[in-house]
């Protein structure tokens, strides 16, 4: 009986180790680009089909291959596709993805409307 338990444990470890480095899901999103737009979440148009964003970034050789690829925040500003370049969690992907970080914009706008007196913090001593 102990051999059956050890055998099933060995099979479990073998299967877990074999799927550790695989990416889940298909690279395509299951639709074609309609007027350059994909309607599936986490997908973008890579003509003629919609592909997952991380697949587009992994296959790209330069930032200019897709309008949302970036290496810095400045790339997003220059392309006009956002104000924040977020990197993918996979370290093998050398490009990031441009986003519109609205909260950052609102914070900057609120900061610019503040007077200089608001920025000075009073020093209070508590004993």
Curated annotation (Swiss-Prot):
InterPro entries: Albumin_I_a, Cyclotide, Cyclotide_moebius_CS, Cyclotide_sf. The modification Methionine sulfoxide is found at residue 51. Pfam families: Albumin_I_a, Cyclotide. Residues 1-24 form the signal peptide. Residues 54-127 form a propeptide. It is found in: Secreted. GO terms for biological process: defense response; killing of cells of another organism. Keywords: Cytolysis, Disulfide bond, Hemolysis, Knottin, Oxidation, Plant defense, Secreted, Signal. Cyclotide cter-M is a cyclic peptide. Probably participates in a plant defense mechanism. Displays insecticidal activity against H.armigera. Has weak hemolytic activity. Binds to phospholipid membranes. The presence of a 'disulfide through disulfide knot' structurally defines this protein as a knottin. This is Cyclotide cter-M. It comes from Clitoria ternatea.
